[in-house]
Amino acid sequence: MIPSGLVYLLYPLGFLASLFFGSAFSIQWWLSKKRKEVYAPRSFWILSSIGATLMIVHGTIQSQFPVTVLHVINLIIYLRNLNITSSRPISFRATLVLMALSVVFVTLPFLYVNMEWMASPNIFHLPLPPAQLSWHLIGCLGLAIFSGRFLIQWFYIESNNTKDFPLLFWKIGLLGGLLALVYFIRIGDPINILCYGCGLFPSIANLRLFYKEQRSTPYLDTHCFLSAGEASGDILGGKLIQSIKSLYPNIRFWGVGGPAMRQEGLQPILNMEEFQVSGFAEVLGSLFRLYRNYRKILKTILKHKPATLIFIDFPDFHLLLIKKLRKHGYRGKIIHYVCPSIWAWRPKRKRILEQHLDMLLLILPFEEGLFKNTSLETVYLGHPLVEEISDYKEQASWKEKFLNSDRPIVAAFPGSRRGDISRNLRIQVQAFLNSSLSQTHQFVVSSSSAKYDEIIEDTLKAEGCQHSQIIPMNFRYELMRSCDCALAKCGTIVLETALNQTPTIVMCRLRPFDTFLAKYIFKILLPAYSLPNIIMNSVIFPEFIGGKKDFHPEEIATALDLLNQHGSKEKQKEDCRKLCKVMTTGQIASEEFLKRIFDTLPAV
């Protein structure tokens, strides 16, 4: 493809390109060290562009297609970094099109002739046997990884609007550079040995600078990072911020939260709503988004170093994050609010809690016993619902507003999400209609959101449930206190019915996939699944939980008829009163545990 005489230009061109690349990284490293942070000056991109242009010519002369095409891609990225801060930056799409056209333009000459993918000039006639295919694959992989670091940097600048380098850039550069160096030593290419050998030093130097900066940055005593991934955690977080502010008004709160936490002054880096998924299938479908959010939280904490981290519930996500933070050297105080259900499944998580936490805040009375023989500090705060429900004042006119019948009430709480309602409400309606109560009672459904009212109405109509009404979630406590009994989907709502002393039957229809995983993979087989039964270690409420083969509406209908007997209802109410007493015994006041956190911050 190129006249053979030009092969003697290889070394001067390659050496000159290496000088430009070396100068670019030397300037970048010197300025970064001066500024005490990883930094990419404009001169870096100019010098790198010149070096890439020379390497494109070098690769073309040497018939090295991978070298040529990867430097073409990198050249476009260098130019994009120069362009993004100009007065007239081109769009991401235009950059992508330009890159694709450049790759096609460079590839065509190589396709036209019978070229070698990774030819070696061997001007010095070194006694090296021909490299096997496996060596060429290693070389191509190393070059792809080494050049791929700029694709990562390009994605970083497009999403963050900054020309700086992410940590992953230097890690990828070090790995790819090592593979490429080993390959070029094998084929005896002195210019690329020089180029990629020297190219390791910027990665090592910048990684050293990054970790040195991370270790030397002081922790911010007045900063508290909080994270909640679910609505229940958001409510806990909002009340916690309220308590902290009353004692420590100078604390700044930021992190991940929902409306309750934001209302109390949390400055969000992400909104809680981005994490709301339920069931194994939904989690699998949201893995990329969850991982992206995980990386953002991790990097933000390590960069700003708040002295206190409080993670609220959402254990699978938060425990992964906590482990990674400790691995990266975070030495501030880490608190987890709400103990993961280690008593139900995956007990090995207890070890993670003991190794990485400074304090665990508990909301269930029996959980303190799980950590009796460990060094982990635990604090039993009690469940926030106990105080909330005991202080709740009913709205007297709610029946006139929502009900058009004086019949006694059977209440239904099918769940808070669309999938929960679709699976559970139909069974609840069928159970009611198959019981004797359908002749004497009305069926009232608590709706978690107005957007689900249509689904509820369609289900009631399809099942022919005539004496039925829908009321908003805000009036659920009024409904619990006024109904004869309730059908409730297993979850927090069951604890609410218990604390309101509402006779209840617990049920939950699982998806087939969730049923399979729960039974055969994770083997979650417990004597009880609802919190009142677990806390009291006895059957307060009957439970119907599982897939289609595990229970039928007729069985729930029979349980409804049994519950309607006066003695059964009074027995449940008495057990609920005992539950309230158990849950209020041994609680620590908020002022006491907050002083343990903020008055004893570690010297970091």
Swiss-Prot record:
Example of a GO biological process term: lipid A biosynthetic process
Residue span of region Unknown: 1-220
Pathway: Bacterial outer membrane biogenesis; LPS lipid A biosynthesis
A Pfam family reported for this protein in Swiss-Prot or TrEMBL: LAB_N
Keyword Transferase attributed: yes
Assigned EC number: 2.4.1.182
Keyword match Oxidoreductase: no
Catalytic activity: a lipid X + a UDP-2-N,3-O-bis[(3R)-3-hydroxyacyl]-alpha-D-glucosamine = a lipid A disaccharide + UDP + H(+)
Region Lipid-A-disaccharide synthase, annotated ranges: 221-604
GO MF annotations, alphabetized: lipid-A-disaccharide synthase activity; phospholipid binding
Gene3D superfamilies reported for this sequence: 1.20.1280.290
Cross-referenced HAMAP family: LpxB (MF_00392)
PANTHER family (UniProt xref): LIPID-A-DISACCHARIDE SYNTHASE (PTHR30372), LIPID-A-DISACCHARIDE SYNTHASE, MITOCHONDRIAL-RELATED (PTHR30372:SF4)
Family to which the UniProt record says this protein belongs: In the C-terminal section; belongs to the LpxB family.
NCBIfam families documented for this protein: lpxB, PRK01021.1
Annotated protein name in UniProt: Lipid-A-disaccharide synthase
Organism: Chlamydia pneumoniae
Lineage: Bacteria, Pseudomonadati, Chlamydiota, Chlamydiia, Chlamydiales
